[in-house]
A protein has these predicted regions:
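Pepsin/retropepsin-fold aspartyl endopeptidases
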Residues: 1-182
Length: 182
């Protein structure tokens, strides 16, 4: 289940992903617009980075990223307020001896979990590089539920997604299209 946050002018609510199998979701953060259309062909979008995705559990978007030479399993979660990484990713990045700040992550069920928040190395998504993002690392329940505790994993939340100008999720074609601010 995805949550459309308040960036859409107060249109906060739950968007069920189960019915999106043949759809394309266009989110224009710059103009506070969202549209859900039938996916009828390739996205012809100038200025976008195209990233192939795999769907897990029917709607969880998984794709390749690189952080300081580490290639974690990455997921996009429009229902997550913050970006989180599992302890395996933190260990893989441990050669960077940065000290983080203890933080609390509150899940959709209002369970609170402790983590360590720190500035992550640049994240490469295709030909797009994101810098200066904060990630909270820890043994979060979501990684256990998705059986991703033993391998580095990163869940990219709205703190990062919302910095983009636009995002297109094409469930039928299994593609993610990102446009960075100009």
């Amino acid at each position: 289940v995805a949550i459309v946050p308040d960036v859409f002018g107060g249109a906060e609510g739950v968007l069920g992903a189960d019915g999106l199998g043949d759809k394309r979701v266009n989110i224009d953060f710059k103009n506070d617009q969202i549209s859900i259309l039938r996916s009828t062909g390739p996205v012809r979008a100038n200025g976008f980075t195209r990233i192939p995705v795999k769907l897990r559990y029917g709607h969880l978007l998984m794709f390749d990223v690189t952080l300081a030479g580490v290639r974690p399993r990455a997921m996009l979660d429009t229902g997550a307020q913050s970006t989180i990484g599992n302890s395996s990713l933190r260990a893989a990045l441990a050669r960077r001896k940065r000290q983080g700040v203890e933080n609390i992550i509150i899940g959709v069920t209002l369970d609170a979990q402790k983590g360590e928040t720190l500035l992550a190395p640049a994240v490469e998504l295709g030909d797009l590089t994101l810098r200066g993002m904060q990630v909270t690392f820890g043994d979060m329940y979501i990684f256990e539920a998705w059986k991703m505790t033993d391998t580095p994993a990163l869940l990219i939340g709205m703190d990062i997604i919302g910095l983009l100008d636009s995002l297109i999720i094409d469930y039928k074609r299994r593609e993610l299209h990102l446009r960075a601010p100009r």
